[in-house]
Amino acid sequence: MNKFYYFNLALFISISFLLIFTLLSALNLIQSNEAAYLIGEASRWCERVSGGLFREPINTLSNLGFMLVGLYMFWVLSNDENNSSNPFIGVNKISILYASVVIYLGPGSMLMHGTNTEWGAWADNLSMIMYIILPWLFNIYSMSKWTISQFLYTYISIVVIYSIWRWFTDFELGINFNLFGVSIGLWVISEALYRYWSPVFRFIAGFAGFLVLMLFGTMPNEVIENFNEFWWVILFWLPGILSNQQPKYSRTYKWFFLGMISYLSAFAIWLTGVPDHASCSPDSIIQAHGIWHLLTAISTYFFFIHFRSIKTI
């Protein structure tokens, strides 16, 4: 098989999506007619809603960043030797999954910003979930007796169940459960476990989730006082329960922190990309939400390098 087979396949699928998406948009077959009255108004993410090709042109096209970064990952993987024990070096099921999910972050978000439809919002949210659950599941896989098949089955099961549940409810699944937000905590917890694994730390690591909550503005006393809303904090101990083996490798954490800095910077900018913020300029070609897309795309690459950086302990 040509070593660039998967890169070429990903490139073909990406270009095909862009062509079909643009054609359907040009024919006005996928935009929301119910929300047509919003044309000319500032969208939820500040940019003025357009009656043209895409409802939010800048917020739509900025998602090309995800597709380009994901394609570059495929290029890097295609040039690797395939004899590495690291699943993020060379072409294999896990590396293909990661790069593919990064690419899909682009189309998922395009479908929302380009159409302003409920199903587009569902596709966008699903793409985010498909990405964010992957790192912490991979970390658990790396600290357990899971086989690759078990890892993939678990990942696919979560995605399928979530996609159906989310379709019929909302982004909190009707039970005050934001899987995307919780997964950020689970990722940080699993990274702490990977770095400092010990039998005792397996049960301490869950508290790191509260540091993540504090970083995003939720204090521990709020969790205690409103436990019916924050019941999901019990999941912070899931990585420790499942990670029953010390990892065989170490990682270079500078790439993880660069990824986090990029993501948190993007999040800070994301907060300004709303109509009632003083910096909102609906007609500007520089949109805060577009910058959010580009910076988070960069963060996925930093995390990619992070997972590629393992060394034998």
What is the meaning of each model-derived region?
Residues 2-233, 245-257, 261-312:
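Early transmembrane hairpin module of multi-pass membrane proteins
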